[in-house]
Amino acid sequence: MWRAKLRRGTCEPAVKGSPSACYSPSSPVQVLEDSTYFSPDFQLYSGRHETSALTVEATSSIREKVVEDPLCNFHSPNFLRISEVEMRGSEDAAAGTVLQRLIQEQLRYGTPTENMNLLAIQHQATGSAGPAHPTNNFSSTENLTQEDPQMVYQSARQEPQGQEHQVDNTVMEKQVRSTQPQQNNEELPTYEEAKAQSQFFRGQQQQQQQQGAVGHGYYMAGGTSQKSRTEGRPTVNRANSGQAHKDEALKELKQGHVRSLSERIMQLSLERNGAKQHLPGSGNGKGFKVGGGPSPAQPAGKVLDPRGPPPEYPFKTKQMMSPVSKTQEHGLFYGDQHPGMLHEMVKPYPAPQPVRTDVAVLRYQPPPEYGVTSRPCQLPFPSTMQQHSPMSSQTSSASGPLHSVSLPLPLPMALGAPQPPPAASPSQQLGPDAFAIVERAQQMVEILTEENRVLHQELQGYYDNADKLHKFEKELQRISEAYESLVKSTTKRESLDKAMRNKLEGEIRRLHDFNRDLRDRLETANRQLSSREYEGHEDKAAEGHYASQNKEFLKEKEKLEMELAAVRTASEDHRRHIEILDQALSNAQARVIKLEEELREKQAYVEKVEKLQQALTQLQSACEKREQMERRLRTWLERELDALRTQQKHGNGQPANMPEYNAPALLELVREKEERILALEADMTKWEQKYLEESTIRHFAMNAAATAAAERDTTIINHSRNGSYGESSLEAHIWQEEEEVVQANRRCQDMEYTIKNLHAKIIEKDAMIKVLQQRSRKDAGKTDSSSLRPARSVPSIAAATGTHSRQTSLTSSQLAEEKKEEKTWKGSIGLLLGKEHHEHASAPLLPPPPTSALSSIASTTAASSAHAKTGSKDSSTQTDKSAELFWPSMASLPSRGRLSTTPAHSPVLKHPAAKGTAEKLENSPGHGKSPDHRGRVSSLLHKPEFPDGEMMEVLI
């Protein structure tokens, strides 16, 4: 009993504290939820129990307060009859509504425990208000659950304010579960039915707790861990299961106790070799009181016990059960005496325990409890009986209470189960005295377990009653505090209501005055309206006249709107026509500007053509003069040749005197004549090129004049078309643009054809120029070679002159020689520009007058001819540079068509008219190897400017 008191004392401070600190099934929230809490007239326990004086005084004081104070009468429409509401005065009704608002606000924002307290106060006030109320003899929470199911449901369905998360899950679960039958509008059970149902639930929870959970390390009064309750409790216990489940559970509990205790006694007897059978009976009552007193594994509540109080223990069983009681004392309660021994005994336990996987024995390190094990443990001790050391026997005896309940096996099966033979020592073999001990122990265990169970139930009921008394004292204290706070708040609210009532009365008086003024104004308005009724007839006649005039005005307005729409459409048409004419005018002006620009360009071309014609006439006169001079020179040279030949024939006798007198003069004459011949040949080739350019320019001018005339005709036709088709100017404009495109395409094709023809002609002229240049080079070479010959070969000069006179036409042999000497014709064009350089270079080469005429003539002629060759080679670069004076940079020739910059080897040139010539010239190596020359020839078509007449005169 001392241990029970100590254990109860360990839990009482936690119970008096916050409910969440030691949340056992007997905590305030659980007590309010439990069905055994609902007892009539504050009598907590039915049957043989009595109500404590403290509880009776508290309830009587609360009821007196409720009856005396009218503010606590909470008149809800769900609780009072209509007659009772009518019987009360206006002040009581106002106070009741104020109290109802305050309680509802507190229910909305308070914690669940405070909500339950407030609801208890509310329903106590409701129950004490009416003397004829049918349920006023119930407790406050029973009144709550039976009379106001809707209020409980509303309080359970409040919006989450943050405090609901602090409550345990089972609280919320049981709150929702308690409201479900009330939602379905089912009749609530009576007190006896609710009590029986709660006791049945507690019996089921006790059995499941013994089968599936492990108790705490300390024994609190009637309390167990919430986790062990929820883990070891199957869903069958939450449903309304029948009495058959309870009977099976009791049978299972009984047989499990018998089997586990018999096995432990057998092990102890085997260890001691059957030596100790009768021990002194001192301490038996103490052992059983301590062992059977607190059962922390059982949940709060009383198992339904249809029998009376248990009978007294027979003395014979007390003597026989001394080993068991000592074993229980050592096995059950060494958690208080030796807290370290549990860890030492449980840790070296090596054998696998065939227990449920959801029950962890060492999860929270609690001490073992009586009658707590897992349900599906089948034959748990064959493995432990094979361990024969004293430590293993202590371990098995210590862990026996943890796994003392097996499946419900009958007693003969438990006794007749074949035990595995021990393997270690022969001293522990089973003997006949051991079987007798086992039988006596089993009988003793049956009696003790039954009476122990009854004692457990009784003691648990006392613990529950004590806990409930504590909870009721706390609840009453809280209810009194809440009542005082409600009284204060209602006094404040009444003062506010009085102030508001005064304010509203003043407002009502003001509105009465305002209403009176409005009625007066309404009467005056009615009088004025009645006086003006006779004037309404005249107004109606005037309105009819005005309506007829309005109709006429509307008709006129419609006509004017139609005319305005027609005028707008006409103005839009005129605007479109004006825009079209403006566009045509702008196109015509652009065309005129374009034609003026073309006219300026063509005038510039005409001026250039006139200048070129003047230059051509000058060139022709100069050419005639040069031809005359060439004739004179030729005749004079022929005469000198004849004279020299005659002298050579006849004057062999006097060879020494003639060279002395005639050698310097002859050398001067030969050098001048050669220079003159070379300059004339260069001028001839240049003027031939200028003539070709002039002819091409004239051809282009004629083509441009023809295209301008054609454009003039087309523009005149287009203007006449625009004038004649002025109405449909858009279509005419589109057609005109198409015609312009077609005309431009035609002009482009014509210009391309003319350009191709001109390319062919230019190529032909270029070939002729090459031939003439080559012929002039050959003539110059022949004259040089004839002058280099000695005096005896002078007749060959005449022969060379004859061949030169005969080679005036273009032959195929000259073309073949042209291919061989492709490099020599480049320098002949620039000899005119290189004449000064030739003179300056040949002057120092003149030797002093030699002794013999032949040697002096030969040396001088060789030097001059060699310099002529080098001058032609050196002046090739100068020719390319000086050609830029006559061949300016490429630019597009201004004309309406597109001029192709196609070179001579392009396939565009190979039309039938010029195909043969182009192929000849492309096959010739001279034409293929000089891209500069081809570029110059093709750039003839792109020269915007040509050399002026002044430059021509300078060149002449």
Swiss-Prot record:
Chief location category: other
* Alphabetically ordered keywords of this record: Cell junction, Coiled coil, Phosphoprotein, Tight junction, Ubl conjugation, Wnt signaling pathway
- The residue stretches assigned to a coiled coil in this entry are 259-279, 438-639, 665-694, 729-762
Where in the cell does this protein reside?
Cell junction, Tight junction
Question: Which stretch carries the motif PDZ-binding?
Answer: 953-956
User: What's one GO-annotated cellular component?
Assistant: cytoplasmic vesicle
> What segments bear the compositional bias annotation Gly residues?
282-294
Q: Which Pfam families match?
A: Angiomotin_C (PF12240)
Q: Which PANTHER family match?
A: ANGIOMOTIN (PTHR14826), ANGIOMOTIN-LIKE PROTEIN 1 (PTHR14826:SF12)
Protein family (similarity comment):
Belongs to the angiomotin family.
What's this protein's function? Inhibits the Wnt/beta-catenin signaling pathway, probably by recruiting CTNNB1 to recycling endosomes and hence preventing its translocation to the nucleus.
Q: What is this protein called?
A: Angiomotin-like protein 1
Q: Which organism is it from?
A: Homo sapiens
The organism's taxonomy opens as: Eukaryota, Metazoa, Chordata, Craniata, Vertebrata
